[in-house]
């Protein structure tokens, strides 16, 4: 039931801030949808994004100076509602991993890796896909294997026994210090 607690707490300005525990609790259906999303490695279609072009910077000579090869891809969250579960969209809106790419109502990615517009469009769409998949993976915490649970219980038991033996040792030491007056 408790899928992930690390997203519930954020360290900010040296203090722990509680951040709505309901965001971290995923139902079985949501967990299945999440795993399906991660497994499929979802990639936005060109009709789901808004693409614009501008002049690229850096080396490239006349190609850089005259052609608009830099690609700016905006992915509005409204476009995601038809193909991605709502709890994931809400996660994308608040996820720390996407904070540098988030704009008011979507995600904005730049690409000027190559000298071709088409390759830069593909690169930008791949960047969006990778970012959203990595962000979704932070929500999933697999079940603890039984071997690890058994090991943890053994360690707890040993720790408790050690604590009790130290306590008995201190008690015995104090009783030996007492002087009995007969």
Curated annotation (Swiss-Prot):
Residues 169-182 have a biased composition (Basic residues). InterPro entries: Mito_Release_Factor_mL62 (IPR052104), Pep_chain_release_fac_I (IPR000352), Pep_chain_release_fac_I_sf (IPR045853). Its main location: mitochondrion. Keywords: Meiosis, Mitochondrion. GO terms for cellular component: mitochondrial inner membrane; mitochondrial large ribosomal subunit; mitochondrion. It comes from the Eukaryota. GO terms for biological process: meiotic cell cycle; mitochondrial translational termination. Residues 161-182 are annotated as: Disordered. One of its GO terms (molecular function) is translation release factor activity. It is found in: Mitochondrion. SUPFAM superfamilies: Release factor. PANTHER family: LARGE RIBOSOMAL SUBUNIT PROTEIN ML62 (PTHR11075:SF54), PEPTIDE CHAIN RELEASE FACTOR (PTHR11075). Has a role in meiosis. Belongs to the prokaryotic/mitochondrial release factor family. This is Meiotically up-regulated gene 82 protein. It comes from Schizosaccharomyces pombe (strain 972 / ATCC 24843). The gene is mug82.
């Amino acid at each position: 039931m408790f899928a992930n607690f690390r997203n519930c707490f954020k360290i900010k300005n040296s203090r722990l801030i509680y951040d709505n525990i309901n965001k971290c609790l995923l139902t079985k259906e949501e967990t299945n949808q999440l795993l399906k999303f991660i497994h499929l490695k979802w990639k936005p279609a060109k009709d789901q994004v808004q693409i614009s072009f501008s002049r690229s910077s850096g080396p490239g000579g006349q190609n850089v100076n005259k052609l608009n090869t830099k690609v700016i891809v905006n992915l509005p969250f409204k476009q995601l509602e038809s193909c991605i579960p709502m709890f994931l969209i809400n996660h994308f809106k608040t996820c720390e991993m996407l904070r540098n790419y988030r704009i008011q109502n979507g995600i904005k990615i730049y690409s000027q890796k190559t000298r071709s517009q088409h390759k830069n469009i593909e690169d930008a769409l791949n960047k969006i896909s990778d970012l959203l998949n990595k962000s979704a993976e932070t929500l999933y915490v697999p079940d603890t294997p039984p071997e690890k649970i058994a090991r943890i219980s053994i360690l707890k038991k040993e720790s408790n026994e050690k604590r009790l033996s130290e306590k008995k040792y201190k008690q015995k030491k104090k009783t030996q210090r007492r002087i009995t007056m007969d």
